[in-house]
């Protein structure tokens, strides 16, 4: 398990754009499961949407990408690098994520070639899939 302090030591992201609170499971270079506690205090709820707060889908994808970045950046050859989004494939959003939800963020890294990685990602709330699809990562200095 990785705490938020551990995550801050790995990722360059900082609040309010750090979207992972904890890593529950990790298999270095292969997969990880993260957690995001979604609270009413999230800055994006101010305008998305007044009176009916919904977490933007792109931020769910970003949270999943941050879990993927943790998988990559724990590998010795990539320590200190930055992982950027290179693409998303066939992403689907199944239901809204609202304040009080706990997002479980599951990412598997299927392929890593040079500085490009591909993987699969799934976000769930209480065991129900809320979003899933493919992610592509690029590693930069």
Curated annotation (Swiss-Prot):
Keywords: Cytoplasm, Lipid A biosynthesis, Lipid biosynthesis, Lipid metabolism, Lyase. One of its GO terms (molecular function) is (3R)-hydroxyacyl-[acyl-carrier-protein] dehydratase activity. GO terms for biological process: fatty acid biosynthetic process; lipid A biosynthetic process. Gene3D superfamilies: Hotdog Thioesterase. It comes from the Bacteria. Belongs to the thioester dehydratase family. FabZ subfamily. Involved in unsaturated fatty acids biosynthesis. Catalyzes the dehydration of short chain beta-hydroxyacyl-ACPs and long chain saturated and unsaturated beta-hydroxyacyl-ACPs. This is 3-hydroxyacyl-[acyl-carrier-protein] dehydratase FabZ. It comes from Herpetosiphon aurantiacus (strain ATCC 23779 / DSM 785 / 114-95). The gene is fabZ.
């Amino acid at each position: 398990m990785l705490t938020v302090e551990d995550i801050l030591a790995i990722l360059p992201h900082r609040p309010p754009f750090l979207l992972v609170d904890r890593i529950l499971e990790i298999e270095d270079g292969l997969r990880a499961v993260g957690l995001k506690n979604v609270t009413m205090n999230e800055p994006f709820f101010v305008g998305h949407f007044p009176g009916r707060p919904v977490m933007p889908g792109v931020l769910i994808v970003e949270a999943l990408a941050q879990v993927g970045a943790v998988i990559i950046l724990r590998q010795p050859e990539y320590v200190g690098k930055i992982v950027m989004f290179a693409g998303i494939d066939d992403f689907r959003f199944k239901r809204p994520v609202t304040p009080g939800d706990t997002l479980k963020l599951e990412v598997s890294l299927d392929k890593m070639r040079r500085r490009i990685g591909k993987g699969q990602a799934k976000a769930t709330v209480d065991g129900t899939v809320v979003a899933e699809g493919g992610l592509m990562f690029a590693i930069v200095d």
